[in-house]
Amino acid sequence: ESKKRIALFAHWDTRPWADNDPDEKNHKTPILGANDGASGVGALLEIARLVNQQQPELGIDIILLDAEDYGAPQFYTGKHKEEFWCLGSQYWARNPHVQGYNARLVSCSIW
């Protein structure tokens, strides 16, 4: 187990509402996930395959999250609108897979 680590995160969920779609009639329909959550997960699965072949000296933790894009839609008028975003990340931050976990976090977006 390497003490030097990086953590790579991706989420597989998508928005249940296309509330930012230019066409207002789509605002209450779900977003298809192939190029949202699924693309990041696919990229991390390929990284995992390559890491397994190369066996780097650096420890690489791949963490897949859910409920990241569940945030309240634009048309929501209730309280606590921000609390519904990044639920998987919030949970993981409070309950890491290893007590005292410490890694360099790598941020990258796939659009």
Language model segments and positions:
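Soluble metallo-hydrolase cores and metallopeptidase-like ectodomains found primarily
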Residues: 1-30, 53
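Acidic/histidine-rich catalytic neighborhood of metal-dependent amide-processing enzymes
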Residues: 28-111
